Amino acid sequence: MGKLIYKGGGQPIEIEDRTLAHLRLVFMTKLRRGEPFSFATHSPMATHRVDLWIHPSLPLQFHFTGSRPPRINQRWMEALMDSANSSDGLRVVPEPRY
């Protein structure tokens, strides 16, 4: 399990490394373009939802537990980017087959 650490939020958010690697690419693409967006996920214990406003001016860190980066699924990246560009903001959608 990796961690997303966002200085605008509270506690680090635990996210599986494969998912976190895909989210990292979406975050970096949006922030490179200067596009703030919302990101919603569940707490590590899934007891509540966490909504974050992701903005280029706030520090962001991705911590991975694995030593090797996972293979990126381009179809999943596109689905996540579509979600990030929607009015609801970025939500983790199920990974489609390659």
Residue spans for each PLM region:
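Positively charged, low-complexity terminal tracts
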Residues: 1-21, 25-98
